[in-house]
Amino acid sequence: MKIKNSLKSLKTRHRENRLVRRKGRVYIINKSNPRFKARQG
């Protein structure tokens, strides 16, 4: 999982990327291609 300051550019890297908020953190998840997972921090 990548940890980035800004997820804006990562969101557009793949069509199926989803932006979710869990426990005050912002994540990008991708079920079909998990290598695009990222967390903002």
UniProtKB/Swiss-Prot annotation:
Name of the protein: Large ribosomal subunit protein bL36
Q: Which organism is it from?
A: Sinorhizobium fredii (strain NBRC 101917 / NGR234)
Q: Which is a Gene Ontology cellular component entry for this protein?
A: ribonucleoprotein complex
Q: Which UniProt keywords apply?
A: Ribonucleoprotein, Ribosomal protein
**GO MF terms on file?**
structural constituent of ribosome
Q: Does the keyword Repressor apply?
A: no
Which is one Pfam family of this protein?
Ribosomal_L36
What InterPro entries does this protein map onto? Ribosomal_bL36 (IPR000473), Ribosomal_bL36_sp (IPR035977), Ribosomal_L36_bact (IPR047621)
Q: What PANTHER family does this protein map onto?
A: 50S RIBOSOMAL PROTEIN L36 2, LARGE RIBOSOMAL SUBUNIT PROTEIN BL36B
Superkingdom of this entry's organism? Bacteria
Q: Which HAMAP family match?
A: Ribosomal_bL36 (MF_00251)
Q: Which SUPFAM superfamilies match?
A: Ribosomal protein L36
The family this protein is said to belong to: Belongs to the bacterial ribosomal protein bL36 family.
Q: Name the gene behind this protein.
A: rpmJ
BP GO annotations: translation
